[in-house]
Amino acid sequence: MTEFVVLIPARLDSSRLPGKALADIHGKPMVVRVAEQAAKSKAARVVVATDHPDIQTACQAHGIEVVMTSNRHESGTTRLAEASAALKLPPHLVVVNVQGDEPLIAPELIDRTAEVLVENNVQMATAAHELHDFDELMNPNAVKVVLDKNRNAIYFSRAPIPYPRDAMRAGKREMPSETAVLRHIGIYAYRAGFLQRYAEMSVSPLETIESLEQLRVLWHGYPIAVETAKEAPAAGVDTQEDLDRVRAVFQTV
């Protein structure tokens, strides 16, 4: 398998759950739990990228490699661009972006996302899973993605895509039957050199409207390969209820 590293963007500010990166999960901060889970993958190296000294201290206390970045980043991807430059990662090296609020992420998903990037010879790869619930299709917090025949992303949106026009006209809460509806999974793989290119690209209007950083890549004409996971991954931590659920999982381990 191609060598890759995991970079984890982590910030302390969170509108829905302040300080969640350092939230205690069975005796360890969440960001440490994420890094330990990522270390179960085939990654050659796992590094947390943060702008906060408290996160840096927590990672160092648990033996997690950490690199400090600016506090002016609008997205995790630009933070990782700075981190990869600071770490002097070679341009060809594969980097997997694991979100800092995913303490239950499957190591196999990390490995597979890196593989998809290499297999498809693209600049960026991500993942999705089939969606079967109508309420989730309509939920703007559930990001959907539609693919072309080559399994590359056509578009990501918080809106219901593909839109079931006939069912909606008839007042029916039915999922599209002609194709699978896919919910995006927030994991990315890219070459370190492309991270630098991403940071230099202009912000796209679609990215701003939808608040989805991956739309910058499509806007500038680069394909994004999408791996379809066999099942939905464990949910990340956005709210206190999510945190309580994750804590319960770790208590049973």
From Swiss-Prot:
Single GO MF annotation: 3-deoxy-manno-octulosonate cytidylyltransferase activity
Enzyme Commission number(s) from the entry: 2.7.7.38
CC terms in the record's Gene Ontology section: cytosol
Reported function: Activates KDO (a required 8-carbon sugar) for incorporation into bacterial lipopolysaccharide in Gram-negative bacteria.
Family assignment from sequence similarity: Belongs to the KdsB family.
Localization of this protein: Cytoplasm
PANTHER family assigned: 3-DEOXY-MANNO-OCTULOSONATE CYTIDYLYLTRANSFERASE, 3-DEOXY-MANNO-OCTULOSONATE CYTIDYLYLTRANSFERASE, MITOCHONDRIAL
Biological process terms in GO annotation: CMP-keto-3-deoxy-D-manno-octulosonic acid biosynthetic process; lipopolysaccharide biosynthetic process
Alphabetized Pfam families for the sequence: CTP_transf_3
EC main group: transferase
Keyword hit for RNA-binding: no
Top-level taxon of origin: Bacteria
Gene3D superfamilies with a match to the protein in the record: Spore Coat Polysaccharide Biosynthesis Protein SpsA, Chain A
UniProt protein name: 3-deoxy-manno-octulosonate cytidylyltransferase
Gene: kdsB
Catalyzed reaction equations: 3-deoxy-alpha-D-manno-oct-2-ulosonate + CTP = CMP-3-deoxy-beta-D-manno-octulosonate + diphosphate
Keywords, alphabetical: Cytoplasm, Lipopolysaccharide biosynthesis, Nucleotidyltransferase, Transferase
Chief localization: cytoplasm
Pathway(s): Nucleotide-sugar biosynthesis; CMP-3-deoxy-D-manno-octulosonate biosynthesis; CMP-3-deoxy-D-manno-octulosonate from 3-deoxy-D-manno-octulosonate and CTP: step 1/1; Bacterial outer membrane biogenesis; lipopolysaccharide biosynthesis
